[in-house]
Amino acid sequence: MEDMQVEKNTEGSSSSSSNNNNNNSISNEFDLETYINNYSGFTKIHRLIFIADNCKQLEVEAYNMALKEVQKTPNLELYNTIINKSHGILELDPVYIENLSKKNSLQLDKLEQDLNTAKSNMVKDSIRFAQNDLGEFYYKIGDHQNALKCFIRTRDYCTTSKHVLAMCFNIIKLGVDTQNYTHAPSYIAKAEQSPDLDNVSNAKLRSVNGLYNLDGSRYKLAARKFIETPFEQSNVFSDIISPQDIAYYGGLCALATFDRNELKKKVIDDPMFKNYLELVPELRELINDFYNTKYGSCLKYLDKMKPILLLDIHLYKHVEILYQRIRSKALVQYFSPYQSVDMNIMASAFNTTVTLLEKEISKLIMENEIQARIDSHNKRLYARKADQRTTTFEKTVQVGSDFQNSSNSLLLRLEMLNNNISTVSNRKDNERGNWENPHHHHQMQHQMFGLFNNNNKF
């Protein structure tokens, strides 16, 4: 059996996801304790470390909270990471380390002995339980490589679809914690096929699928998966994601990729996603302002929530891309109803200068997103009109050509019927593809049109 690999990450997912700076400033109204209580398990710890690494204002508070949480687990590796990262804020406790090391060693010996006993008894369920317990222990101490091996090995001892579903979720959980989604698609698909998939499991899979697509910058797919996540079950898997996260991820990805009709139908008017938006009123107002072409207000909301989004362990690296796409869409939609626009007024609407706006518009024109030309002297933007005369002529020629081809085909068929001519295909020729031979088809057509021209009575 092939063992699957997981990337080694000695500092948890938080280290690989860091912005590598500590300069993000955030409003004093932000309550870290309220925010972090939306999460549980290692997700909570990794988020605290990420926030401490990237926000000087919250550094001390976040490291202290992370230390308190990690001491509820047997993960010494993560404990050491937090101490080292704190740069003297926290002190190492040698007694705690020694005691926990002994405890972990005894627990590992016991679990390995249980597995060996189960294997010697050759009882499938016992082996699966033992492998799963060992994998769970490795997961808790931060040994993700061995945890993955154990979870994969339970596959050979699964006797029901529920067992398979549990195995899939264990592997998916590892992927989310390490932010390594290599195995996510196959195990999400396998889990979705389970006849025992309940509503909670289905919601969990949708949200994880959303994270997988977000990580791969497939923003439209990510938006769809988050929007499809049932609201009633969204607060029961806080070890992965919070309902507020689903609102932010789904809403921003939708703004960046959905057209107006999709935004109205699948986000604004969707009864299920409305519940998520109620949890984040500013996001709800932002989306409504965008749809109602109140771009100045929309952009102000985006600027206000940006510091919080940059402290999100999954979203931070996509914020600039999503913001740029949303802004570009707003510029295109603002200009689309007009033949010309005063760029001074447009710059005011988008909280920018005419010089910067001109650069943005130039880029959109180069990318063929806006059909327009810029009058730099008068600071006006003019819609580029298509040559209606040429377009009409080309359409007329195409319609005439289509009509001629259709008429010739009809007349040919009528003449063949009048002369009792039919085509019989040879099965072997068909299998070889001779019926598609262009030379054969052209020769036959030439003969038929010759017959048509000689006997034409029309």
From Swiss-Prot:
Q: Secretion signal: which residues?
A: none
Write out the ranges of the annotated region (Disordered): 1-25
Query: Which keywords describe this protein according to UniProt?
Result: Cytoplasm, Nucleus, Signalosome
PROSITE patterns linked: PCI (PS50250)
- Know anything about its domains from the record? The PCI domain is necessary and sufficient for the interactions with other CSN subunits of the complex.
**Which Cys-Cys disulphide bridges does the record give?**
none
Mind telling me what this protein is named? COP9 signalosome complex subunit 1
Instruction: Classify the source by domain of life.
Output: Eukaryota
Query: Subunit structure, briefly?
Result: Component of the CSN complex. The holocomplex is comprised of 8 subunits csn1-8. In the complex, it probably interacts directly with csn2 and csn5.
Ranges of Basic and acidic residues composition bias in the record = 1-10
UniProt feature, compositional bias: Low complexity? 13-25
Looking at the record, the residues that make up the PCI domain are 218-388
Similarity annotation: Belongs to the CSN1 family.
User: What is the taxonomic lineage of the source species?
Assistant: Eukaryota, Amoebozoa, Evosea, Eumycetozoa, Dictyostelia
InterPro entries membership: CSN1_C, PCI_dom, Rpn7/CSN1, Rpn7_N, WH_DNA-bd_sf
According to its UniProt record, where is this protein located? Cytoplasm; Nucleus
Give the function comment from the record.
Essential component of the COP9 signalosome complex (CSN), a complex involved in various cellular and developmental processes. The CSN complex is an essential regulator of the ubiquitin (Ubl) conjugation pathway by mediating the deneddylation of the cullin subunits of E3 ligase complexes, leading to modify the Ubl ligase activity.
In the UniProt record, the gene name given for this protein reads: csn1
Q: Name one GO cellular component term.
A: cytoplasm
